[in-house]
Amino acid sequence: MTRSVTHLFDEYAQAKTAVTALERAGFSASEISLVSRYRDDGTLADEASGTTKGATVGAFAGGGTGLLAALGVIAIPGIGPLVAAGVLATTLVGVAGGTLVGGLLGALTNHGVNEKDAHLYSEGVRRGGTLVTVRVDDQRAAEAERILNEQDPVDINARRTQYADAGWTGYDPKAPGYTAEEIRKEREIYGRLR
């Protein structure tokens, strides 16, 4: 049986390191997905040239090997352009084309993430976080968890509480992605609480 092991990272570099570590441990690029609003050069995906609204995969976004070599920019209604690779990227291209309701939230729930966590992960990406998910057999789930935890992911329960304390009730797919300035302020408010 397979399951999704999913973690949110405040920093793109943490997620990139986690993906590299997963691949070095023998997880295949076909099992791993990365979704972010950031590109390798530290700019937001919506600052990348060649992105448009709708069902597009735009400019090459990252460097690296394996999964990271396949990063592309995908324009998703609601959040805006995302840097994505892996099975979730394929699903998101379908989302942008209107074949799946719910955008990132729907893609995550379709890949086995429970709805409560999918709301938090989608909101985290909207606010500038980077999501890494691994679709693995139960026998390798603990190994994937250990590798992702080594990169200091967000404590989603603490983050959910922080968001709720500020009035958040759930992910709104119609809300725009945060600007670079809003992301900076978010990091100041929430710090890197784990």
Regions found by a protein language model. Give the residues of each.
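Intrinsically disordered, low-complexity, hydrophilic segments
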Residues: 1-194
